[in-house]
Structures are given as structure tokens and as C-alpha cells.
Swiss-Prot record:
Function: Endonuclease that specifically degrades the RNA of RNA-DNA hybrids.
Matching CDD domains: RNase_HI_prokaryote_like
GO molecular function annotation: magnesium ion binding; nucleic acid binding; RNA-DNA hybrid ribonuclease activity
Family: Belongs to the RNase H family.
UniProt-listed PROSITE patterns: RNASE_H_1 (PS50879)
Ranges for domain RNase H type-1: 1-142
Alphabetized UniProt keyword annotations: Cytoplasm, Endonuclease, Hydrolase, Magnesium, Metal-binding, Nuclease
Requisite cofactors: Mg(2+)
Keyword Metal-binding among UniProt keywords: yes
Protein name as it appears in the record: Ribonuclease H
């Protein structure tokens, strides 16, 4: 039987682009594991993606996951848009390269061994786990230590 895991995620960017961070909280039964990291120059969408990626990549066995994000970009992208992006060779409907393709591909790989149900929660609306992830993300953004090597200025 697979483990039932809840994941909560959030990304933050101080300026967009600017210093950014992600926060994630993994919960299995009574155990919780917070994750966060800060990047010197990135975007809010990249940090939202990184939160989900980091959390999923932390799981060591196949799991049934409920992943809660306040990012419609992440939820819509992974449940809907990604199918056509892949069919078109990672191009949008108007034949432009998909933004953040490095992270979309990494997220696509990260979900393969798990059963993931994506849930959207309204950000900054008092959802306790989302608020905790927001605090982790903002703290990480305020003290960035990493380079987002995939970030490309437009």
C-alpha cells in the first residue's frame, strides 16, 4: 500500500524578477517536513514550480499525493497545458517556446512515480499550511544563497 502524503507549496519573489524563494511542507501521518531555498534572481512562477518539484523529489517511495498550491499557473500547467506542450515539442499554441521549460520537464519527471491530485487553495486567505509555506518562501527569498541557473531574462 502506498503512503498517503499531503504536500503544501508556495513561491515568493521580491520583485519579479528578483530574489525569490520557495516553501513546501510535506505531511505523512503525524510527521511534517518543511523545505525551503532562496535564489538570487528568479521569478514568482519559477519559485511556485520549484516548491512542487522540491517536495516531490524528496519522496523516496511511490506515494499517493495530494498537492495543494495557490498557483493556478502550476495547477493548470501540470494538469492541462503540459499535454499539448509535449505534443508540440514544448511549444505553445502560437508556436513559441514554453516558458520555464526546464522546470516543467523536471516536474513532469517528478510526478511519474506518484499518483498526484492537484488542489488549488486561495493564497493569503488564512489557509494555515499555505501561510506557513508563504512564510518559508518569503524568508528564503530574503536570504538567497542559490543561483537559478535555468532563469532566462526576457
Amino acid at each position: 500500500m502506498r503512503k498517503q502524503v499531503e504536500i503544501f507549496t508556495d513561491g515568493s519573489c521580491l520583485g519579479n524578477p528578483g530574489p525569490g524563494g520557495y516553501g513546501a511542507l510535506l505531511r505523512y501521518k503525524q510527521h511534517e517536513k518543511p523545505l525551503s531555498a532562496g535564489y538570487r534572481l528568479t521569478t514568482n512562477n519559477r519559485m511556485e514550480l520549484m516548491a512542487a518539484i522540491a517536495a516531490l523529489e524528496t519522496l523516496t517511495t511511490e506515494c499517493d499525493v495530494v498537492l495543494c498550491t495557490d498557483s493556478q499557473y502550476v495547477r493548470q500547467g501540470i494538469t492541462s497545458w503540459i499535454h499539448n506542450w509535449k505534443k508540440r515539442g514544448w511549444k505553445t499554441a502560437d508556436k513559441k517556446p514554453v516558458k520555464n521549460v526546464d522546470l516543467w520537464q523536471r516536474l513532469d519527471t517528478a510526478i511519474q512515480r506518484h499518483s498526484v491530485r492537484w488542489e488549488w487553495v486561495k493564497g493569503h486567505a488564512g489557509h494555515p499550511e499555505n501561510e506557513r509555506c508563504d512564510e518559508l518562501a518569503r524568508a528564503a527569498a530574503g536570504a538567497p544563497t542559490l543561483d537559478d541557473t535555468g532563469y532566462q531574462a526576457e
